[in-house]
């Protein structure tokens, strides 16, 4: 039974999902926006959020930050994918937001990959943004100046999210090893040098870093004391597999 313990901590969810931060204090990275006294942090803490676009590479926390904003401001949160949604879905969501507004509740509509919407789809948000029915938060890996139409862009603040630094990724990996939502209930032996190796490989992407650690731990060697040891050899094998599958990884966190 001890050998199965690694699978008992709700591993129906990936490690990155289990460790998704719920507060600004848990959030790692983007200190240029979220450090004490920084503009975006002040807007969140004072509940003065308006429509905005998060522009940044994959795995830097765009979706997570939108959820934290919704939790902090006590707004209804509607997660909306530009890949699977059209005008019909937009109208349905806007109707729900109007209902919330009548009851005095704010609605944050988070649109992942907003650059995938065409002009007509983006225009469908305009009247609701203008009259304050919704707070629109869009996420994109593409330059919004070219991918978001000017009318909508002019009504949104653009915040640039940066790749996580190697030290920030190492911090995240160490948390995964100690947090009960991660591997905190297990005894995992992995050298700091290997954690840094994962962080460098992840190239600023938190999801890739956590997924790599998860694969390495689940493929580690169990010793007589029920500890899992992650060796350099095991990690290198995992890195080679992840490298092969890298183009298909999700593009946001």
Task: List where the protein language model places each region.
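Single conserved hydrophobic/aromatic residue that forms the stacking wall/gate
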Residues: 242-253
């Amino acid at each position: 039974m001890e050998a199965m313990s690694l699978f008992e901590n709700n591993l129906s969810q990936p490690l990155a999902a289990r460790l998704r931060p719920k507060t600004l204090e848990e959030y790692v990275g983007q200190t240029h926006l979220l450090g004490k006294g920084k503009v975006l942090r002040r807007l969140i803490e004072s509940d003065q959020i308006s429509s905005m676009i998060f522009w940044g590479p994959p795995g830097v926390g765009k979706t997570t930050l939108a959820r934290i904003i919704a939790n902090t401001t006590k707004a209804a949160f509607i997660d909306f994918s530009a890949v699977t949604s059209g005008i019909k879905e937009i109208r349905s969501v806007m109707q729900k937001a109007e209902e919330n507004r009548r009851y005095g509740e704010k609605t944050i509509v988070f649109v992942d990959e907003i650059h995938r919407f065409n002009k007509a789809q983006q225009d469908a948000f305009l009247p609701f943004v203008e009259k304050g029915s919704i707070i629109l938060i869009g996420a994109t890996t593409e330059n919004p100046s070219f991918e978001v139409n000017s009318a909508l862009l002019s009504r949104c603040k653009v915040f640039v999210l940066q790749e996580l630094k190697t030290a920030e990724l190492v911090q995240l990996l160490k948390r995964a090893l100690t947090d009960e939502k991660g591997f905190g209930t297990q005894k995992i032996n992995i050298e700091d040098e290997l954690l840094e190796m994962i962080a460098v490989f992840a190239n600023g992407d938190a999801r890739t870093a956590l997924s790599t650690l998860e694969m390495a731990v689940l493929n580690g060697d169990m010793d007589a004391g029920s500890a899992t040891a992650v060796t350099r050899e095991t990690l290198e094998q995992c890195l080679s597999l992840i490298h092969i599958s890298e183009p298909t990884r999700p593009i946001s966190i």
